[in-house]
Amino acid sequence: MGLETEKADVQLFMDDDSYSRHSSVDYADPDKFVDPGSDRDPHRLNSHLKVGFEDVIAEPVSTHSFDKVWICSHALFEMSKYVIYKFLTVFLAIPLAFAAGILFATLSCLHIWIIMPFVKTCLMVLPSVQTIWKSVTDVVIAPLCTSIGRSFSSVSLQLSHD
């Protein structure tokens, strides 16, 4: 990228400092289009989805395409990503938000009214079950394992070579 060497009606100068590295569309006056107070991802849940042109397409130093091709492909990449995302959100955002709302409402209701009462009941009953289980193991399982261990400890093997 850089200064186009061919003569043209319009020239594009791109310095590394002034070149935008983010993946959104640059407006001439961004304050008109973006409300600075509305952060739609305040918890940074989708910070991994910031994919720029350089993250997807990269030309090594040894193989560079023409500057116009590079600039046009960059512009087409950004515009197609922007337009397709807007198009998909128009048709998918409302139905998927509705489905996600139903799903989370159902899961919340199940968690609040079924799962947590069941867990709390189990935690209340567990000390009693623990006492009963300890008694059963002391009375039945421990003597059984002790007698089996003593029986096997008295077994001896002798090997002879004939």
Swiss-Prot record:
Quaternary structure annotation from Swiss-Prot or TrEMBL: Monomer or homodimer. Interacts with CAV1; the interaction forms a stable heterooligomeric complex that is required for targeting to lipid rafts and for caveolae formation. Tyrosine phosphorylated forms do not form heterooligomers with the Tyr-19-phosphorylated form existing as a monomer or dimer, and the Tyr-27-form as a monomer only. Interacts (tyrosine phosphorylated form) with the SH2 domain-containing proteins, RASA1, NCK1 and SRC. Interacts (tyrosine phosphorylated form) with INSR, the interaction (Tyr-27-phosphorylated form) is increased on insulin stimulation.
GO cellular component: acrosomal membrane; caveola; caveolar macromolecular signaling complex; cytoplasmic vesicle; focal adhesion; Golgi apparatus; Golgi membrane; nucleus
UniProt tissue specificity: Expressed in aortic endothelial cells.
Organism: Bos taurus
Protein name (Swiss-Prot/TrEMBL): Caveolin-2
Residues recorded with modification Phosphoserine: 20, 23
Post-translational modification, as annotated: Phosphorylated on serine and tyrosine residues. CAV1 promotes phosphorylation on Ser-23 which then targets the complex to the plasma membrane, lipid rafts and caveolae. Phosphorylation on both Tyr-19 and Tyr-27 is required for insulin-induced 'Ser-727' phosphorylation of STAT3 and its activation. Phosphorylation on Tyr-19 is required for insulin-induced phosphorylation of MAPK1 and DNA binding of STAT3. Tyrosine phosphorylation is induced by both EGF and insulin.
Family membership noted in the UniProt record: Belongs to the caveolin family.
Coiled coil: none
Membrane topology annotation: Peripheral membrane protein
Subcellular location: Nucleus; Cytoplasm; Golgi apparatus membrane; Cell membrane
Cytoplasmic side: 1-86, 108-162
Principal location class: nucleus
